[in-house]
Regions:
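Short C-terminal boundary/hinge segments that cap the last helix of small helical domains
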Residues: 40-58
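Amphipathic alpha-helical segments of tetratricopeptide repeats
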Residues: 81-89, 122-129, 161-168, 201-212, ...
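DNA major-groove recognition helix of helix-turn-helix/homeodomain DNA-binding modules
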Residues: 30-45, 270
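Residue register of alpha-helical TPR repeats
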Residues: 97-99, 135, 139, 179, ...
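Alpha-helical adaptor scaffolds
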Residues: 137-214
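Residue signature of alpha-solenoid helical repeat architecture, marking inter-repeat boundaries
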Residues: 55, 91-98, 132-136, 172-175, ...
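Short alpha-helical DNA-recognition segment
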Residues: 1-18
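Structural register within alpha-helical repeat arrays
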Residues: 64, 104-107, 140-144, 184, ...
């Protein structure tokens, strides 16, 4: 076997590695890959090791969470909470704590209760602390948008773009980040927080340039129309947003077209 000192030499300090092992520190992808190489473990082998915890995969959790939220299923949310609580006690993995925080805030929302800032702060502190954002951090941020204070959302959106740049060539990453930016724009417009939106539109357009993600391109255009409308360029903004709704009807998405129209109607002739 290899000691912690032998494994970490020249890559990270021994105290850092010990804290990482206990879940008290995050590590950059570059250093993590170097550690795997030092241990003669391929990334594929690492994935197989992770597969041992397939029953506890984040993907499975997110699918169940989505089902619960779409159906306003409080019973399922409570069951998910109990499951994640058991997993946190068993594995002491921070993701289970993050999941518990997210679930508890949605339970509060459905019960008409206030959010819990001290819990949400654990998620924002984690996001500020991580040096490189991967899929986990992007999804965590996206799933926490309803709870994070508005004044922190724009700052975290800049961090999300900058700290995930290493993955900018990945189509999956581009798709995930563009969806999250779209959700951020929606949240900021909904809360009438228009400062900095223009920069987010530029970032989204740059991300989506050259892609075939027409649905997301159309959504960004829709929000841009509302932004222009609210900023005083009424006719142009209204035309752009209505064109986006028309495209949805052409794409045979009348349900989404109605949802967009209802959102737009809130800003017409205010």
């Amino acid at each position: 076997g290899m000691t912690l000192e032998e494994a970490s030499k020249g890559i990270v300090s021994l105290p850092f590695l010990s804290k990482f092992e206990r879940g008290e520190h995050e590590i950059t992808s570059n250093k993590f890959i170097r550690l795997l190489s030092r241990l003669n473990i391929s990334y594929r082998e690492f994935e197989l090791i992770l597969g041992h915890l397939e029953g506890y995969s984040q993907t499975a959790f997110l699918q169940q969470l989505s089902t619960a939220l779409v159906n306003n299923d409080l019973a399922l949310l409570n069951q998910l909470y109990d499951d994640q609580k058991i997993l946190l006690k068993q594995y002491s993995d921070s993701r289970f704590e993050h999941n518990l925080i997210i679930i508890s805030q949605y339970i509060n929302l459905l019960n008409g209760l206030s959010f819990e800032p001290h819990k949400i702060k654990k998620i924002t502190d984690y996001l500020y602390r991580v040096e490189e954002w991967g899929e986990y951090e992007l999804v965590l941020f996206g799933n926490s948008l309803n709870f994070i204070p508005i004044e922190k959302i724009y700052n975290l959106s800049k961090i999300a773009i900058n700290r995930s740049a290493i993955f900018s060539k990945s189509p999956k990453h581009v798709n995930e980040l563009s969806i999250i930016i779209g959700n951020i724009i929606h949240t900021l417009i909904e809360n009438e927080h228009f400062d900095g939106l223009n920069n987010l539109f530029i970032q989204a357009e740059n991300l989506l340039s050259g892609t075939d993600n027409f649905a997301e391109i159309n959504r960004i255009n829709f929000y841009k129309g509302i932004y222009l409308l609210v900023q005083g360029n009424y006719d142009k903004g209204l035309s752009i947003s209505q064109q986006a709704i028309s495209i949805l009807n052409q794409m045979r998405r009348p349900d989404l077209a109605r949802e967009y129209k209802d959102f737009l109607d809130q800003y017409i002739e205010r």
